[in-house]
Amino acid sequence: MTEKTLLSRKHDRAFGHLDRNGTGFIEREDIIDLGERVLSAVGEPTSSERGAELLGAFGEVWTVLVTACDRNADDKLDAREYHIGMTWAFVQDEEGYDRIFHPAVKAVMELADTDGDGSLQAGEFRAMQLAFGTPADEIDEAFAGLDRDGSGSLTVDELLRAARQFYTSPDDRDPGNGLFGRI
């Protein structure tokens, strides 16, 4: 058996964020459920403008993935299809990341910034991470690993860079690898 690459292990973690019911598949409802968990964690109604924006962005991510990678046309993705889709749509196609995935990530980060100061404090970061399903005992470590300047906060821009590294970078030196805990 070959060892999984860093990017594959990160995509496994991301697949787990979505497959919370343990079916081994991701469906559109799973992606929308993640959006609803994020909204709930930050106290934002799904019916608000920001809530609708986030859910719409998550819906766009789903559309790109399922269109590109649902090989058997069953409207769900198994782990292999998900890995292929993430790699094709957002790693190999940087414009795809910028056009489709970045807006969804940005919407999450801006919603998590509940006081609107342009950065996430440890508590805001924790709420976002718990919504994603990051193990609670790894959240403080993730925050510290991303807080490279020791300021006690993470700017939305820093988090956007970390997310890009997490979802697209094979470089094991990137701090964004730890965005969702230990890989």
Residue ranges and their predicted role:
Residues S8-T23, A52-D74, H102-G116, E138-V156, ...:
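Primarily EF-hand calcium-binding motifs
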Residues R50, G96-Y97:
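Short, intrinsically disordered linker segments that flank or connect zinc-binding domains
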